[in-house]
Amino acid sequence: MQIEWLILLLPLAAASGWYAASRAARKESAKSEREANPVYFQGLNYLLNEEPDKAIDVFLEMLEVDADTIETHLALGNLFRRRGEVERAIRIHQNLIARPALSREQRAQAVLELAQDYMRSGLYDRAEQLLLELKQGRQYVVPVLRNLVKIYQQEKDWDACLKTIEALDIESGETHDLQKSHYFCEMANKARADGDNEVARIYLKRALNVYKGCVRATHLLARIDIQENKRKDALVKLLDAAERAPEYLPEIIREIVDIYRSEGDMRGVRTFLEDQVKRHPNQGTELFLAEIIRQQSGDAEATRFLGEYIAKNPSMPGLIRLVELQCTMPSMGNDHLLYNVRAHLHRLMSERINYQCQKGGFEAKQLHWQCPSCDSWSTIKRRSLIEADNQIKTVKEVL
């Protein structure tokens, strides 16, 4: 039997043994002790013979539920759920709820745990039913509302998310304005998918009303403007987003440059890029600026700019573009080396993880507004300059 099972069930076995012994002591009866011991040792025998489910049944049957033992039940069920043994957690919590000796508070606690078991199993309907029962009875209201929000997020029921999180704000005294703004953005995306830009605009304006700094809403409004050929309006919104949240500049820079170019304002785009390169290094603006320099002044000038730039602000994309420009220059007898370097850099770039959740550490190659791992909103950011430095060191080691 795996050692983990022994470790998991030892607390229950110990509690059962203690309970049996204390019961015998209270009755001061050797006969009672003899009657308890065979059942207890039967449970241990199941445990040692790789039959953990039977062991659980025996120990739970022995262990009457009272103020001294309910925490043992709850702790064991919680432990099973955290380990992914959800069916066993469900059995333990259902066993608790079926006991008539439970107080109202104890039953509510067990119901909350069972609801979380169902959530872990993906049985959201069952979990929601239990949580709504607790909510109606005004029991564990704050954790109940938190779990309901998680369920509605999984089901993408954004209207229910909004109503529930507003109730959570009232009950907990907290504010979740950023989260609400994302719910409105999700509703706007649904409206856009249905071809209703006007409804989408309404949702996005509501997102900005509840959280003024919602760069996602600003970006989506700009995209609607672009779709409706209102490019100047879109540019104003995108420049505002870049100013408010420069960390998201890589997500919007291409649209900014495209609008400037479509308007024929090359002076404006160059001024914007030069300003961003100075203020916010390694956000991708250096690549666009290098391309404009190349178009206006040639490969040599673009190469000089990028060489000086990455000497101060190392970045993998900048290094790759520099090598590509070097490959276009007149041959210096090292073409083979340059092409090999470029191939290695592209391989490393394709393997690189660009984004990471600042809360739970989840890694991704693209931006997620909600972390797929911890479900937090706006916590996934691009990797830092320190990690870019580490990538440069990796390149040197490989080559």
Regions found by a protein language model. Name each.
Residues 42, 76, 114, 148, ...:
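Structural register within alpha-helical repeat arrays
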Residues 72, 106, 110, 144, ...:
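TPR alpha-solenoid repeat register
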Residues 32-68, 75, 81-85, 91, ...:
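Alpha-helical segment of the N-proximal tetratricopeptide repeat
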Residues 46, 80, 118, 152, ...:
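Residue at a conserved register position within TPR or TPR-like alpha-solenoid repeats
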Residues 1-34, 129-146, 150, 154-173, ...:
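Long, contiguous interaction/recruitment modules in multidomain scaffold/adaptor proteins
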Residues 67, 101, 105, 139, ...:
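Short coil turns that delineate tetratricopeptide repeat
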